């Protein structure tokens, strides 16, 4: 097969943070196949991130939420939409499909199997936890947290013929935009953790206390997030009037610009922490029920491993309980909304986060 004839479909039907963690895998494939057509299949909401990743990708979108419940296919309009999309995939004549997903649930595995078969590609590569009988090349899935998610996805790309590359997720810095004018010294706070699991969200009044302490130390708090999360930004702004509220006010390239200029970035398990890591910006990430070994921002270490003599610029703050993580543990989906008390998250005190911020600022 000539390089120009190679057609690769990368499947990542996930949120922004998960897509960013796939950047090394995408880079691995583009490095190995510079002349190939590489298409990236993502949900509509994450498509804008592809431009920030670079790598000369064509982007296809698939509204996976419409088909999360397979009984939805019984609706005539949904079934027709799925058939039309399947025909679109078939007409693209892909040689290889790279599935950058764990096959965690039977329904999820069925969805990936359908997408792969719709393409009629000869090669289908992905993680196998026992549900991957449709794969032609398999990477053994050792369970969530046995490897970092970025490492898992890079392993899949390598199994598809990808080149060895730096495993740290990166963004195309030429695509980063300056965004709003900000003071010279500021700290970014992202209080929300996205729509999938609100159980990862630390209490907003504690973010207000962190913002107050940062302001007292001469760092202007800058709050970022989506327009739908604006009430969290308003709460922090009311607590600390000097706060600059950019909730819903930036594009992704502008958000990257805001993060790039920050002295430190503070928040929960979500996209902005991964973006800070990709831009090599100091960061403190608060974990509750989700799996920190799987999803910690790349290069971030447990806060107890950070001291003023270290070179780490990212710390993870958490309380390790026997029941934690309860979201994406082993091979199970677990509990997206955590337990009713969310003890692991609520035990993280403001003082602990401020201590982590102090350690990272001194170390970096």
PLM regions with names:
Residues 1-364:
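Catalytic machinery of carbohydrate-active enzymes
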